[in-house]
Amino acid sequence: HDVYGFDLRESQYIDSFACNAFDTDTLRKVITEGNYDTVINCIGVLNQFAEQNHALASFLNSYFPHFLADVTKDSNTQVIHMSTDCVFSGKRGSYTESDFQDGETFYDRSKALGELNDEKNITLRNSIVGPDINPKGIGLLNWFLHQEGEINGYTKAMWTGQTTLQLAKTMEQAA
């Protein structure tokens, strides 16, 4: 596969475009002219940061996935959008895909509003664990690796996430 990244800075790992997601005109042009098979949206504002930055979370978590779907609607380009299992609060359990998304935090609600539900595009709803390019990242693996001594955590908890490697394989199959 030919893979191109989109980030604020060009990547040292893959060919990429440096641009801000708020520059929707440039992004629309890049996607339209690129004639891509798939656009994978991994942009998002996570948990606590979303709670402190409602406007940013609303744009990136809620509006932006629908912007991508709109840009690609008259093309063969499919959008694969990353959501989260946090759209469900977990209070009831045994959720199905079509259940009401009862997450209660701003993060949960902003991610729920961003989910794409149509015949063309795909929303992957999960949590992930894996290496983080940012040494100060808030991911589960980074958190675990920075702990010293006894680690506080949960008991009798079920986690439905997958590794970043498995997520990449899932995305490849979905594309």
Predicted regions: what is each one?
Residues H1:
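N-terminal Rossmann NAD(P)H-binding glycine-rich loop of SDR-like oxidoreductase domains
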Residues F49-A55, G90-G93, N134:
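Conserved catalytic-core motifs of eukaryotic protein kinase domains, centered on the activation segment
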Residues L8-D25:
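Rossmann-fold cofactor-recognition segment
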Residues F22, Q52, L56-F67, Q101, ...:
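Glycine-rich NAD(P)-binding loop of the Rossmann-fold in SDR/ketoreductase-type enzymes
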Residues E104, L116-Q166, E172:
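NAD(P)-dependent short-chain dehydrogenase/reductase
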Residues H66-D102:
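Conserved Rossmann-fold NAD(P)-dependent oxidoreductase catalytic core, especially the SDR/UDP-sugar
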